[in-house]
Amino acid sequence: MKKNYEISEYGVIRSKEDYDIESSFKSLKELYLPKELFNDLFEFIMQNQEEKKEGERMFSIFSRGKKRQIKTKNYVGVIETSKGLTLEILPKIFFDYSDEDYNTELLDTKKVFLKMLSKLKNSPFLNISSAHLKTSSSFPLLEVFIENYIKDIKKIIRCGLKSQYVDKQENLNFLKGKVVNSLNIKHNHSNKAKFYCAFDEFSDNMVYNQLIKSTLLKLNRISKSHYNRTSILQLLHHFDPVKESSDFISDFRKVGGNNRLFLNYKQAISWSEVFLMNKSFTNFSGNSKNMAILFPMERIFEDYIGYLCKKYAEGREIKTQDKSYYLVEKRILSGTPKEVPKFRLKPDVVSRETDSTLVIDTKWKLLTNSPKGNYGISQSDMYQLYAYGKKYTVKDKSPALILLYPKNKDFTTPLDDFIYDGDLVLGVMPFDLKTSLNKLEEEKEINKVLKASSKTSIYNFQLQPLNMAAEDKTEYIDR
């Protein structure tokens, strides 16, 4: 029996067999799986992480005595294993809910996550409409993704399946194209009435449609939704003359690029890569029996804030991943200074008005309320923002600098400003993601950032040497 389970980032997954836990227990911070499902997930993770360095691993594996445990990191999405486990890993969103409000918290977390995911650049999730978000957040994430793929294929079919010339070789009773001499001799040496020919044929049995058919067949096997499976079977009738793809890697290479004749296939092919190749933004991959669609929340948060800044720009010029400056402009080559820019700077958001510049860098990390540990702010991030401040200074006027983090229970209001030197000031602000559930609140929240100005209070921030262990402890703290 297939079952859907949910856990949040930095949540801990354990085997039920190792703990005396009530069957009714529900929490996004902890998950207790039946032994068979836990072992299946554990083996899947171990296979993917065996040769990876600690910093590249998407899960932490540890033990308490003989009890194995799995801890999620800052990657979200869906994993499906061979034993029927569907695991949704959701972002850690700050809500004021009690433990009894599990279902409400789960629903609202998925609403926020799907909205953020729908703004992820260069991804198929861009077609998740706001109207669809309202109705789909109560469904399993995988089924939401499948339903969106189905919608894309229906659009293609309404316009008619595309055809293109494909290379064919057949033994015919008439001459068509050109004779393949070696094959003609092999097959027709005693039958001069036939010709083994190579020719081009205009057919819908071509690579785009083959990839879509392969995807539909896979989704029909893994979907748990009667509605989705019924829709898939209806769509497959339109692909009866089409064969399955025999080489996914080769076929996806063939459909790469921007072929204007197949623009209406672009979104569907992106989804096909997600489902057939587990192509998200990670190197955590499945196989024929397992599937993993995982995304780094750092990237999702960055793109979502960039989207909001553009949406509520109000006359500001907004650039995301701005590439105007390099850290190094010149080098001494053969004793002569030459323009050889190196180390391009790419702040997440640059907002410009007539006489002011605002540089925003987003960080998906849980800050603390402890000045002793620098609140969990990375020293390298402080250096990075200092470099932005120096490079984006225009006519001796420094830009406003903002480090933006998700709001959490220990970080609910902006920290006192950090003074680098002169008028170069850094603000560290929380962003309340639950405001995305209400358009007016969302606009107010992003405008707090866009209209941020230096406060009058001065906080003497002193950089202390930080070791990675201390930073990791802050980032992975259970909330």
Regions found by a protein language model. Name each.
Residues 1-49, 288-479:
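Catalytic core segments in nucleotide and nucleic-acid processing enzymes
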Residues 2-285, 290-291:
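Residue(s) in the substrate-gating loop at a strand-loop-helix junction
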